[in-house]
Amino acid sequence: MGSLMLLFVETTRNSSACIFPVILNELSSTVETITHFPEVTDGECVFPFHYKNGTYYDCIKSKARHKWCSLNKTYEGYWKFCSAEDFANCVFPFWYRRLIYWECTDDGEAFGKKWCSLTKNFNKDRIWKYCE
């Protein structure tokens, strides 16, 4: 028996709900629904936020040309493109290995570039970014 793929996009004035792809192949089907509202330009990024199966501590570039963030702790369709002020800040002090750091460090970085943790406990969370 062959496969049938459907693409359904419904757009309203305030949002668009995309359902894609719907593949009907014998007895199985897959449906993914994502709701995106128009960008909220004056909103504030919420970190960390949950999107699909991940938790994000900084702006992401998932299915977009530019980095964006969620305006809710769990993504509910409200978002905005990130500006320089929106990116996650370093958390000080943070714990790395057996030391507490009060500023960016190059410890453990192969190329000597300074970095910081985005949570208080790098050993547990392993979330970081390079320092500017």
Curated annotation (Swiss-Prot):
Keywords from the UniProt entry: Disulfide bond, Fertilization, Glycoprotein, Repeat, Secreted, Signal
Sample GO molecular function, one term: heparin binding
Paired cysteines (S-S): 45-69, 59-82, 90-116, 104-131
Predominant location: secreted
Pfam families the record matches: fn2
Sites carrying sugar chains: 53
GO terms (BP aspect): single fertilization; sperm capacitation
Domain of life the protein comes from: Eukaryota
Family indicated by similarity: Belongs to the seminal plasma protein family.
Reported function: Binds sperm in vitro and promotes sperm capacitation. Specifically promotes capacitation induced by high density lipoproteins (HDLs). Also binds heparin, phospholipid liposomes, and weakly to gelatin. Does not bind chondroitin sulfate B.
Protein's name in the database: Binder of sperm protein homolog 1
Organism for this UniProt entry: Homo sapiens
